[in-house]
Amino acid sequence: MVVRREKKSRKMRGSRTMGWGIRGQHRDRGSQGGRQIGMHKEKWSWLVKYGKGWYGKHGFRNPTTKLTSAISLRKLNELLESGYIKIKEMDGKKIVDLNELGYNKLLGGGSISIPVTIKVGKATNKAIQKVKEMGGEVILSPTE
């Protein structure tokens, strides 16, 4: 391809269309924007098909809400049996510290098959009862 030494715009002055052929070819829609620009104009058809809920108000996240990271006895039992959670031995007791693992509440769903001492911030009455029936205990130690 031949290198253009002078600008096309400079060479074609006075030629009515300046290299764009028929007059209407250069009268197109201009810049349609980049990423996520013009959703209410140029990209409306895409928005109608894929962008449900693009416009409007959609609530907010309450900054004072405290999120709880809970684990059920069923899930805890699975993690203990698979070896994913290591049991610590201290004074002949098997101890699992859920606060260290990022959980702050123990739920009573399911059952546990290993008698362990569980340290956690909060626990339901049902969970405490089931752990005691198995021969373990629940120590409530708030993290906050």
Swiss-Prot record:
An example molecular function term from Gene Ontology annotations: structural constituent of ribosome
Residue pairs linked by disulfide bridges in the UniProt entry: none
Protein name, entry field: Large ribosomal subunit protein uL15
Residue ranges of the region described as Disordered: 1-35
GO biological processes: translation
Database matches in Pfam families: Ribosomal_L27A
Similarity remark: Belongs to the universal ribosomal protein uL15 family.
Membrane-spanning parts: none
Alphabetized HAMAP family for the sequence: Ribosomal_uL15 (MF_01341)
Keywords: Ribonucleoprotein, Ribosomal protein, RNA-binding, rRNA-binding
Main function: Binds to the 23S rRNA.
Compositionally biased intervals (Basic residues): 1-14
Subunit and interaction comment: Part of the 50S ribosomal subunit.
Gene Ontology terms: cellular component: cytosolic large ribosomal subunit
Gene3D superfamilies linked: 3.100.10.10, 4.10.990.10
Gene label: rpl15
